[in-house]
């Protein structure tokens, strides 16, 4: 991955029509599948939100996905947020969209449709200040200490940052997240912080083939949310 990233220009804004068509067709297939699943489950249209993980994708590819109907993006690595944010923000504004926080963005239309920009990967404390001008939600907060650090930075900038508390439902050592038994208490503490908006809980299912085991992880998380 490192070698690949060293050779790809993530700030590139131009892609050919063949690649744009591939992206458009892929986005439409996923959106159609979500709509069918909503209908089958008796859910309201649009109640399931699709976040496009844009790791290793350049600005041009991401904009092609937005042109195809993506309305929420997420980056795994703070370095990629920093590399792509300026170009994405400008091109989104050209299309009447406002990306992420829009902090300090004088180009965004006053009536712009908002495209949330999430950090979905792990966040080191020394990178907090570098991503806050752009991302509006951090999905990988695994404890009070990290939340406090984010809150201090957010208050200093005069903004409010959304966070998801990551819970390690699978119990796998390779996964981050707090202990499920501590999640309610940690969430309550995070919710009290200035500059933080607790938006919910997240987990990554167990890395197994047994669907019942994977579903149990998410079912338990939902039960915790409803506590």
What is each PLM-predicted segment?
Residues 2-226:
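Conserved alpha/beta-domain cores
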